[in-house]
Amino acid sequence: FMTSEDLWFRPVDIKMGPDGALYILDFYNKVIGHYEVPLTHPGRDRNRGRIWRVFYTGKDGKQSPPPLPNFTAMSVEELIKNLGSKNQTMRIMAGNELVAREDGDATKSLLAAINKPADNFQQVHAMWALLRLNALPDQAIETIITNPAPFVRVHGIKMATSKPQLNEGLATLVQKALEDTDGRVQIAAVQGLAQHPSEANLKAILSFRTKVNQNDSHLYYASRLALREQVRNPEAWKGLPSQSSDPLALKALADVALGLPGASSAGFLANKLALIQPEGDREIAAVRMITRDGTDADKTYIVSYMKNAQRPKARQAE
């Protein structure tokens, strides 16, 4: 896309500007491999850098550069219109300006825009602006969580779960989103519920964790992390985990228990070890955790468990 005969040319970042031009950050330095050159080397340049502005000049090369928009001079109506721009930077900067003004008229216009949006972009960015102004109704979030467009549903879930408290209605919708047909929506729901530990969310995440496709490494890891966050509080182990008897659910809980040292998680492992039946290194890790963090009763049990006559002598020795 872009080359230079200048041997100091070091492009390190690229952004699209609100004017539609591309801005390329040029570190501009003689040194290429910084791990090879001492910090005190005189060839290191500490004073210069360049920003390249790249824009279309037309087939004849005579087209003028695009003008830079002045958001501070725009009316509320112009800013709201730009929330629907095809240029993401334009949308973001227009939203930032609306929030920075803290204008009551802007809030009213934003509320009107989300009720009759020109397009999905305008609706989403108007809602984020209202959320930042603490003026976004929960009903509006509920509406877009079920929007036909997956990217809109993702934003709705992120808005809902960014709140300090997730009310029951929104929580139910986010839980249902775990069954969405779009992977981006699912991972947004998983990551969002991770921020709101509760018995209902734990149940939803645990059920999802046992069904998620392990070949989807991102979603699989996100569900694992979310499950851990649901039981990070030691009190959480006294609820659903202690009552569960489903082998798949217990294995999923045991997986995260090993990453949460403490008496509660160790007690869970001791009580459910016979049902979980961990193998190899997982079993050794569970035994070590129980003997380290468990109660005296847990430790007594684990000794009898390991001495079971049906167990190989080599495994008992380990």
Where are these regions (language model features)?
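Extended surface/linker regions that mediate inter-domain or inter-protein docking
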Residues: 1-18, 53, 127-129, 287-292, ...
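Beta-propeller domains with acidic blade repeats across secreted/periplasmic ectodomains
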Residues: 1-78, 99
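Short beta-alpha connecting loops at secondary-structure transitions
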Residues: 7, 32-40, 64, 176, ...
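Short, cationic low-complexity segments
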Residues: 70-84, 247-251
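Structural detector for internal amphipathic alpha-helices that build alpha-solenoid repeat scaffolds
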Residues: 64-69, 89-102, 121-135, 140-146, ...
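Short inter-helical turns and helix N-cap capping residues of alpha-solenoid HEAT/ARM repeat scaffolds
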Residues: 86-87, 118-119, 148-149, 181-182, ...
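Short linear, low-complexity motifs centered on an aromatic residue
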Residues: 233-251
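Buried hydrophobic core positions in alpha-solenoid tandem helical repeats
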Residues: 78-79, 109-111, 140-142, 173-175, ...
